[in-house]
C-alpha cells in the first residue's frame, strides 16, 4: 500500500487504511503528530498492510516495515503544566468502510513550551 494523502490529522493509504492521533485535551495544551513532516521518500514506498509501530519518547514515532521506517515528529505546545501524552491509531479499511482504529502506541510528545 502507498501513501496517497497526508493532512494535519492523518496519513491515508491507497487501500483506505489510516494512521491518526488522539489526545484528550485538558485545557491549554495542543498535543499532535506532525504528519506533514514525513520524509518525501515515504510517498514512493510500497508498505505491507501489517505495519510495525515504534515510539520514540519525547520526539515522535516510527511506522513501516522491515528496512523502511518513517519518522513522524510529535509535539506538545503548552506551558509545562499539562500532559504531553499522545495516542497513535491504525485504522484498516474493509470493502470501502473505515473500521475503528486499533490503538498502536501511547507516549509523551516533545514539549514545545510557551510562556
Give the label of every model feature segment.
Residues 1-115:
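Surface-exposed, interaction-prone regions used to assemble/regulate multi-protein complexes
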Amino acid at each position: 500500500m502507498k501513501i496517497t494523502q497526508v493532512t494535519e490529522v492523518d496519513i491515508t493509504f491507497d487501500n483506505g487504511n489510516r494512521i491518526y492521533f488522539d489526545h484528550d485535551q485538558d485545557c491549554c495544551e495542543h498535543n499532535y503528530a506532525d504528519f506533514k513532516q514525513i520524509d518525501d521518500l515515504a510517498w514512493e514506498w510500497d508498505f505491507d498492510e501489517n505495519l510495525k509501530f515504534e515510539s520514540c519518547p519525547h520526539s515522535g514515532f516510527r511506522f513501516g516495515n522491515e528496512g523502511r521506517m518513517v519518522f513522524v515528529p510529535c509535539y506538545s505546545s503548552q506551558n509545562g503544566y499539562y500532559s504531553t501524552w499522545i495516542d497513535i491509531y491504525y485504522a484498516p479499511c474493509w470493502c470501502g468502510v473505515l473500521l475503528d482504529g486499533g490503538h498502536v502506541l501511547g507516549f509523551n510528545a516533545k514539549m514545545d513550551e510557551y510562556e
